[in-house]
């Protein structure tokens, strides 16, 4: 029988044979995180390749932007898997958390920021007024960088918070994110590009609207508004077959109507935090004031 080496802190020494079968389990979530990084990298490459076609009038740029958006969407999917796999296999680690954060900066910060500028600003009609074009391009640099900066700040805030759940999370059996998660912001950018047929923006009013969306997403990521995290979904609970049916239906809709369905899902999720915030403000204003306790102020 092999000897189990136990350290002073009660953990099993890595040299012990008891730890060797666990190494493969630790590598599994890291494999998904590495895939996340790869998808972010190739998304940036595709955005660059599409942007280089601006000089030729944009002919042939659409396939590159479509792939860039799809790679971001696949990265969102992998990002949702690596954490769940680590928790299911009890292989969470500080290294895994840090690597996952760096992967998120690449796939959901840099990749969508580059795509947002290349698709939304790079192909403006050259016939528009030069002064307008110059200003739109300048704001394009600023707001695409702002998206990256706010997404990175969102990740940093999440990492340092011991309990990144709002003090008033609503129903106690549900978990919420504080602010829009950076994968959701990246998914919104990718879904708009994908739903448009990946045809880049040519008219400056549409480019201004695009920059306004980037500004909104940047604000939501660093806000303290509540967003449902979906982390409490458990298919092993009673009546979980209803969740399975819903997920199956959703997969069918995405498979057959991917462009409108993905855009609708991303838009609904982004809007959900705004609706929750507005609803909370309205409820507080409509809440009746507590009755004044006049008896305490009366002089006997």
Regions picked out by a protein language model, each given a short descriptive name:
Residues 1-80, 276, 300:
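Topogenic membrane-insertion module of multi-pass membrane proteins
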Residues 84-96, 152-168, 222-230, 278:
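C-terminal ends of transmembrane helices
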Residues 41-44, 74, 78, 112, ...:
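Alpha-helical transmembrane segments of polytopic integral membrane proteins
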Residues 28-35, 68-71, 102, 106, ...:
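Alpha-helical transmembrane segments
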Residues 1-18, 166-300:
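C-terminal membrane-associated helical module and adjoining short loops/tails
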Residues 42-70, 114-142, 192-209, 256-260:
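Helix-coil boundary and interhelical linker segments in multi-pass alpha-helical membrane proteins
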Residues 38, 77, 81, 85, ...:
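Active-site His/Glu-centered metal-binding helix of metallohydrolases
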Residues 31, 63, 70, 88-156:
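Multi-pass membrane catalytic core of lipid/isoprenoid biosynthesis enzymes
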């Amino acid at each position: 029988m092999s000897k189990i080496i136990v350290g002073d802190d009660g953990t099993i020494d890595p040299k012990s044979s008891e730890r060797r079968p666990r190494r493969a389990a630790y590598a599994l979530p890291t494999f998904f995180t590495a895939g996340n990084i790869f998808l972010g990298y190739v998304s940036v490459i595709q955005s660059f390749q599409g942007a280089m076609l601006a000089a030729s009038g944009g002919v042939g740029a659409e396939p590159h932007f479509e792939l860039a958006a799809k790679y971001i969407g696949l990265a969102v999917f992998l990002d949702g898997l690596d954490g769940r796999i680590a928790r299911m296999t009890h292989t969470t680690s500080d290294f895994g958390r840090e690597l996952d954060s760096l992967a998120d900066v690449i796939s959901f910060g840099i990749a969508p920021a580059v795509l947002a500028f290349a698709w939304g600003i790079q192909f403006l009609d050259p016939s528009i007024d030069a002064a307008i074009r110059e200003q739109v391009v300048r704001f394009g640099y600023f707001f695409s960088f702002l998206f990256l900066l706010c997404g990175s700040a969102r990740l940093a805030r999440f990492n340092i918070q011991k309990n990144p759940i709002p003090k008033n999370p609503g129903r106690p059996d549900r978990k919420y994110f504080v602010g829009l998660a950076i994968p959701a912001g990246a998914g919104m950018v990718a879904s708009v590009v994908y739903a448009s047929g990946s045809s880049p923006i040519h008219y400056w009013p549409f480019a201004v609207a695009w920059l306004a969306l980037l500004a909104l997403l940047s604000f939501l990521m660093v806000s303290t508004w509540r967003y449902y995290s979906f982390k409490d979904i458990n298919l092993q609970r009673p009546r979980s077959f209803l969740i399975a049916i819903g997920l199956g239906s959703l997969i069918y809709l995405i498979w057959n109507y991917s462009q409108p369905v993905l855009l609708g899902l991303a838009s609904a999720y982004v809007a959900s935090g705004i609706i929750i915030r507005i609803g909370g403000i309205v409820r507080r204003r409509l809440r009746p004031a507590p009755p004044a306790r006049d008896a305490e102020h009366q002089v006997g």
